[in-house]
C-alpha cells in the first residue's frame, strides 16, 4: 500500500510546486484605467498585454496594448479604435502621461501613478481611500464608478445635462471567472442595451479569449452583435 501511495504523493507535491499563485484582486490603477480606456482589467504581475476585439467577420475593430512596471504602473498605453477612428498612445514621464508622438503632456497623475486630470478636456478624477477612481467631472458631465470588494469594476453612471446613462455589471460568482459577466445599460432609467461575456482563462485567472455579445435595445427590432476578444499577456 505504501509503495502504491508514493507516486501519488510525489505527483501532488510536484504539482503544488509548479502551481501559480493566483491574485484575485485588481489594483486601483488597473481597474481605474480599464474604466477610462475601455478594456478588460487584468490581475497579477502583468508585464505587458494586448487585447484585440474582432467582429463576426474577423475584422479588428479595437485594440488596446499596455506595458506595466513591476509595481503595477502603466509605463505605456495604446488604444486603437477603428469604429470611432481614434488612436491614443501614451508614455509615462514622471507625474504625466505624454503623447507618444508629440510628447505633449496629456494626463496628469496623482499618488503613485493614478489618474488625476486631463487638462485639454477639463476633466478631473477623484479617488477613494484605497486609490480607486470613483468620480470624474468636467463642466459638461459627471461620472461615478463602482467596484466590488476585489476591485472589479461594477459599472458607472454618467450625468450630462438632462441625460443619465447607467451601466451595471454583474460578474460571475466564481472569483476566478470575474470577466464572465452580464451588464445592462439604462438611459434615463429606460433599458437600452445589454451585454454578455464568457471567457477562457489562464493560470493567473486572466482571460485569454472571450465571446462578447452586445444587444442594442434602443432600436426596434433589437440588434445583436457578436465579438471575439483575443488577449496576449506576459508576466513578470
Curated annotation (Swiss-Prot):
Localization annotation: Cell membrane
Cleavable signal peptide: 1-16
GO cellular component assignments: plasma membrane
Principal location: membrane
Matching InterPro entries: UPF0257
Cross-referenced PROSITE patterns: PROKAR_LIPOPROTEIN (PS51257)
Annotated Pfam families: UPF0257
Record keywords, A-Z: Cell membrane, Lipoprotein, Membrane, Palmitate, Signal
Lipid sites, type S-diacylglycerol cysteine: 17
Domain of life of the organism encoding this protein: Bacteria
Lipid-anchored residues (N-palmitoyl cysteine): 17
Topology within the bilayer: Lipid-anchor
Family per similarity comment: Belongs to the UPF0257 family.
HAMAP family the UniProt entry points to: UPF0257
NCBIfam families documented for this protein: PRK02939.1 (NF002798)
Protein name in UniProt: UPF0257 lipoprotein YnfC
Organism this protein belongs to: Escherichia coli O157:H7
Amino acid at each position: 500500500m505504501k509503495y502504491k501511495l508514493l507516486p501519488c504523493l510525489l505527483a501532488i507535491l510536484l504539482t503544488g510546486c509548479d502551481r501559480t499563485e493566483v491574485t484575485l484582486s485588481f489594483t486601483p490603477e488597473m481597474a481605474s484605467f480599464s474604466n477610462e480606456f475601455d478594456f478588460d482589467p487584468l490581475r497579477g504581475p502583468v508585464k505587458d498585454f494586448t487585447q484585440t476585439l474582432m467582429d463576426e467577420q474577423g475584422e479588428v475593430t479595437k485594440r488596446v496594448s499596455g506595458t506595466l512596471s513591476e509595481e503595477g504602473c502603466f509605463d505605456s498605453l495604446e488604444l486603437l479604435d477603428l469604429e470611432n477612428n481614434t488612436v491614443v498612445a501614451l508614455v509615462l514621464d514622471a507625474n504625466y502621461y505624454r503623447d507618444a508622438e508629440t510628447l505633449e503632456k496629456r494626463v496628469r497623475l496623482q499618488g503613485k501613478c493614478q489618474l488625476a486630470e486631463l487638462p485639454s478636456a477639463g476633466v478631473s478624477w477623484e479617488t477613494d481611500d484605497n486609490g480607486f477612481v470613483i468620480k470624474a467631472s468636467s463642466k459638461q458631465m459627471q461620472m461615478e464608478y463602482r467596484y466590488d470588494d476585489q476591485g472589479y469594476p461594477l459599472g458607472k453612471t454618467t450625468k450630462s445635462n438632462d441625460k443619465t446613462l447607467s451601466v451595471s455589471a454583474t460578474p460571475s460568482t466564481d472569483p476566478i471567472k470575474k470577466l464572465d459577466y452580464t451588464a445592462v445599460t439604462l438611459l434615463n432609467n429606460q433599458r437600452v442595451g445589454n451585454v454578455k461575456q464568457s471567457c477562457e482563462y489562464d493560470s493567473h485567472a486572466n482571460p485569454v479569449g472571450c465571446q462578447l455579445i452586445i444587444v442594442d435595445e434602443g432600436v426596434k427590432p433589437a440588434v445583436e452583435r457578436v465579438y471575439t476578444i483575443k488577449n496576449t499577456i506576459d508576466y513578470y
